[in-house]
Amino acid sequence: SFQSPLLQDLFRAKDPSLSAAALAAYGGTLIAVSSIFNGLGRFFWGAVSDRIGRANAFRIMLATQLIVFAALIVTKNPIVFCLLICYVLLCYGGGFGTMPSFVNTVFGSTLMPAVYGAVLTAWSAAGIVGPQIIAAIKDRAPESAAAWSFAVSTGILAAGLLASLTLRDRTADIG
């Protein structure tokens, strides 16, 4: 995760006299707190999807994260940055927590194993390729790497939101 270095950069810009230890403590605290939100997201978004439907819950996660990532492009306030990152991790955990039931509800129990396998493979591939893309951006444009990374992520979220509009929850198991 590059949330800690980004937060440290924001604090350093705000107060250049902060020690490396203080900056590392701020970054470590964000990682610890945001991981709690990751865990809570599994329960929170599961409850939301039970109430409003799987596809609708994913649409809300995608749409709200699109807004959050757009805000991350321009935020300079470390506290606002932390709050936005915690929300992103709430949705990340929510994605993992609701994905099995989402796939089953949208694609049916017969297709569920194959589709869920493909989803997890894609998610894993993104976890490998995404940081490589961010590292390449950071190598080529270190001063604006965060903004570019958040902008690319915003575009990917927009594509996901548009794709989600083609899906619907099925009320009966078609499998």
PLM regions: where:
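C-terminal ends and interior cores of transmembrane alpha-helices
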Residues: T64-K76
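Extracytoplasmic gate region of multi-pass secondary transporters
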Residues: S1-W45, P100, G130-I134
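Hydrophobic core of transmembrane alpha-helices in multi-pass small-molecule transporters
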Residues: V80-G94
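Intracellular juxtamembrane helix-capping segments at the cytosolic ends
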Residues: G94-F107
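Multi-pass alpha-helical transporter architecture, strongest
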Residues: T154-G175
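Cytoplasmic membrane-interface "Motif A"-like loop-to-helix N-cap segments
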Residues: D50-L62
